[in-house]
Amino acid sequence: MPLSFKSSSFCLLACLCSASCAFAETRLGGNFVPPITNQGEEILLTSDFVCSNFLGASFSSSFINSSSNLSLLGKGLSLTFTSCQAPTNSNYALLSAAETLTFKNFSSINFTGNQSTGLGGLIYGKDIVFQSIKDLIFTTNRVAYSPASVTTSATPAITTVTTGASALQPTDSLTVENISQSIKFFGNLANFGSAISSSPTAVVKFINNTATMSFSHNFTSSGGGVIYGGSSLLFENNSGCIIFTANSCVNSLKGVTPSSGTYALGSGGAICIPTGTFELKNNQGKCTFSYNGTPNDAGAIYAETCNIVGNQGALLLDSNTAARNGGAICAKVLNIQGRGPIEFSRNRAEKGGAIFIGPSVGDPAKQTSTLTILASEGNIAFQGNMLNTKPGIRNAITVEAGGEIVSLSAQGGSRLVFYDPITHSLPTTSPSNKDITINANGASGSVVFTSKGLSSTELLLPANTTTILLGTVKIASGELKITDNAVVNVLGFATQGSGQLTLGSGGTLGLATPTGAPAAVDFTIGKLAFDPFSFLKRDFVSASVNAGTKNVTLTGALVLDEHDVTDLYDMVSLQSPVAIPIAVFKGATVTKTGFPDGEIATPSHYGYQGKWSYTWSRPLLIPAPDGGFPGGPSPSANTLYAVWNSDTLVRSTYILDPERYGEIVSNSLWISFLGNQAFSDILQDVLLIDHPGLSITAKALGAYVEHTPRQGHEGFSGRYGGYQAALSMNYTDHTTLGLSFGQLYGKTNANPYDSRCSEQMYLLSFFGQFPIVTQKSEALISWKAAYGYSKNHLNTTYLRPDKAPKSQGQWHNNSYYVLISAEHPFLNWCLLTRPLAQAWDLSGFISAEFLGGWQSKFTETGDLQRSFSRGKGYNVSLPIGCSSQWFTPFKKAPSTLTIKLAYKPDIYRVNPHNIVTVVSNQESTSISGANLRRHGLFVQIHDVVDLTEDTQAFLNYTFDGKNGFTNHRVSTGLKSTF
């Protein structure tokens, strides 16, 4: 049975504090003197362990050492080493095992400020396992073995490089698994791999962790700022963020030539796997490589094979720098398949601003070098990557001679976008023209080359816009889009199946003519599209297809690039007919007999109305987007024109998308009206109290309103809550005068569109009542007048196939409310109603209710901006009904229940209305709020409970409804009379 330190007399290192040299104060029992050499033990901690200032440089073995397996079981406790000196002999370390070294079930493992100058580093073993730990932390450790290389004096001299010493040094494998909260390597220093340095055959795995992984400000003197060596480095199925930032290495062995092996000295600012594979696979959290640097190759990642596949979280490689090759990644074989967004930005290198691919990477004996990129469920973009030896020259990828671009693909609605160009070289001996596939294996998205975002100065340098793909580019599916002055030069071109070439303003597909290149092939275009957005501008430039000495053959028909019809048909250029010279075709021969003039299918849409067509003949009476003749005074031969014809002779009819009406803005006036109404209704409590004196009332109010879409107008629904404070004077003759103030807060949702308006209302009311007594009857006249000011904030999200544009707007409403009501026993005067009135103690009432208001104008910010004019509206109704009161016989808390029932017709109305204007083209459309039905039912149930002689409690429910419209209001509160 393995030895277990469990009892209080054998509490392993649990109380080892302030250890110094070999004289450490412990409470282990017996004569304990480190180091401990165990033969296959399992060690359990019984309390948190802290080892501080332990000096073990002179020890002949590790502090804790096993010649076989060793397991440290934390039982939820912590293990901490701070400011300790590891042994220097052989491969000894602070902790080591000849076989498997396991750390399991710790709340935290923390190594801070430790040092080692030996070969073993801090933790050494054949197989090292960290499992089920909350926090794993290594900070400011120094593991600098010297010398880093040794050259013998024999002839021939043999130079050996020592890569081993590091914080973690596995010879066969390292597994970091099920870490729950944090993994942190900060400010560590070593020769190779400040965090991990492993043998060339070792496998390192970070798998199934939920922790945030942070590797920052680490440094090495010879290679791999954080991780070095091994045959495989795997990050898989991790759900937390993975961050490599501000790591770096230098090349202190510059000039040293190892006699054997591949070391990639001074390469990999974060990761260096000279002859192995790096895999970032199926992770859910965001991954970031930023501000890493190296004086040689690969600012962030150096690997012979690099696979980045299946990651759902965003991947960002930003501002990494290499003095030579690959600002972010340097690899022999690179395979990127993203399930989330991936961005390469602001990386710099001498070659390959973001990525360098070539057979010179890794083991020189392996010559196969390939690049494959697939954007699967998110966009991949290269933007702002530069060559550091040529300021102002942009470059995304450099594929050196011998490297092969296998495919560039995007799946479905995803896009692979190159704002920076690609550079491709071929071998000087026996070069071949190989296929480069766009959208391989059924991918159907967009691969885009664009120079959008370049300054006018950058556009003057051809290298900033020109991509060179030395092979025959074949579009298997989806589209290859060349736009915004980007140039793509190839050795041949063909569309296959549903593959489509899309041209935008200034886009050029040309023939590459490098020295010694293999024979080029003809250009065959079976499906051609154009991007109307880029051409419908005054500074547009015709695209070009130039096959040089080869032939160009076109078949099929011209189509519109897939686009958001809302954006397209809002463009001012489509107010009237326009002709666009979209492309000029050049070559030894240009065959277009299979591409005759024709109509372009134009599905029904909102916005400007008209039809598209295309022709090889210049339209003489229709201007170009810049107002000139299409194609200029002397158009080039083989120019293809796209023509927009308006639906009327004068101008294109404009139809606004109902989703953009924004009737919720007009309906916000209805909400303000209802807010005033709800605020005034609950004043009924004050009017019913017959205790004379000065009264103070405090109430809470909640309301729900819903109106279904009707007659082509939007519906709306909302919930609101607030308070009211009132001051009133009650007289003995039932005369009342009062003043109230309050606020309402709520949110209104449009139906059926995704628009939400939040409101904050401030309300002020003046109210009162007085009796009118005659010989035959008594009438009670009451009035309520309220003013409301509301601040509104609108958020709108539009439904689009590939994006969700959003806009925001703010404005205020001013509203007023007046109610004059007369309560009279007229039901007793009518023979038909008298029996019912006497049986139920009914009293009749008739009222006149006035609602009105106006709202300020405003302009939205964000996408698809709209401007709304000042709006206004009002409504007049004449409620008529009856009320009844019941009294409870309770002595301690008697209550009075009042019920009102009324028919409520709207006799005059001007619906709230505005004018909405589309900002991009100044097209205006009148809109109005919901068209509520004019006949409704009003029910109010009110209960007053006398808590004391001078204090009453209220509970009030009101239903105000029409066909398709419902308004529920609930209030409760207290009143005190002085």
Swiss-Prot record:
Keywords: Cell outer membrane, Cell wall, Membrane, Secreted, Signal, Transmembrane, Transmembrane beta strand. Pfam families: Autotransporter, Chlam_PMP, ChlamPMP_M. It is found in: Secreted, Cell wall; Cell outer membrane. Residues 662-978 form the Autotransporter domain. It is a peripheral membrane protein. Changing residue 379 to D: In strain: CWL029 and TW-183. Residues 1-24 form the signal peptide. Disulfide bonds: none annotated. Its main location: secreted. It comes from the Bacteria. GO terms for cellular component: cell outer membrane; extracellular region. Belongs to the PMP outer membrane protein family. This is Probable outer membrane protein pmp14.
